[in-house]
Amino acid sequence: MNFTDRATRVAIIANGKYQSKRVASKLFAAFKHDPDFYLSKKDPDIVISIGGDGMLLSAFHMYEKQLDKVRFVGVHTGHLGFYTDYRDFEVDTLINNLKNDEGEQISYPILKVTITLEDGRVIRARALNESTIKRIEKTMVADVVINQVVFERFRGDGILVSTPTGSTAYNKSLGGAVLHPTIEALQLTEISSLNNRVYRTLGSSVIIPKKDAIEIVPKRVGVYTISIDNKTVHYKNVTKIEYSIDEKSINFVSTPSHTSFWERVNDAFIGEPEH
């Protein structure tokens, strides 16, 4: 077995901020001459994301075709992020934990997105946080189908479908529930729905179990804006967009420093109670 076969392959991905570059340099120096590690962005075993949650989203999409083989770990160089276990001043702890890593992981569900266009084209994608469909110019009218049952006819700005880890992002700002990331479920949340004596929607978020699927079927021709995490695309004449739990998941390195989900929620939205 050669050196690279024996060593853990590590990819270090950082944003352009000064502090992120400093952390990346320290990690490079620590692993460069360590025989147990091999620095490579090609086919890594571990991806270290340095920056914020946006950087980890980018790292996820960079390696989304290798999810069976890769584990992620995040280092935050700003405020605490939901996908980061380490702050920039905890790099030595991260290095020590990785040197003692035994391959344990924590897995979270991700979203499978299938977009069907009028011309027959099918676009497939994955989202770690969420996906939205909107019609910017006019009110969006679409049937919401859950597990092949027409649930409602939606009228409004758009619809968001989020994963449990994404429930604390855009979904929460829309009044959706916060789900623990180990719950294998999707959440459907309306964006500025029309509700009056003529038009009615449920008006609250819906939690969809793993075995069920969501279909959004637009009822008007036109250009639709579809977001997949931090990327936005525009498609003309969308026939339907399907959402379900993907058969793959995202895996994070499980270390003694792994921060519990509820600690992250507290730090992000509540903070320490006053005494």
Curated annotation (Swiss-Prot):
The keyword Kinase applies. GO terms for cellular component: cytoplasm. Its EC number is 2.7.1.23. Its cofactor is a divalent metal cation. It comes from the Bacteria. GO terms for biological process: NAD metabolic process; NADP biosynthetic process. It catalyses: NAD(+) + ATP = ADP + NADP(+) + H(+). Disulfide bonds: none annotated. It is found in: Cytoplasm. It is an enzyme of class 2 (transferase). It holds the Pfam family NAD_kinase. InterPro entries: ATP-NAD_kinase_N, ATP-NAD_kinase_PpnK-typ_C, NAD/diacylglycerol_kinase_sf, NADK. Keywords: ATP-binding, Cytoplasm, Kinase, NAD, NADP, Nucleotide-binding, Transferase. Involved in the regulation of the intracellular balance of NAD and NADP, and is a key enzyme in the biosynthesis of NADP. Catalyzes specifically the phosphorylation on 2'-hydroxyl of the adenosine moiety of NAD to yield NADP. Belongs to the NAD kinase family. This is NAD kinase.
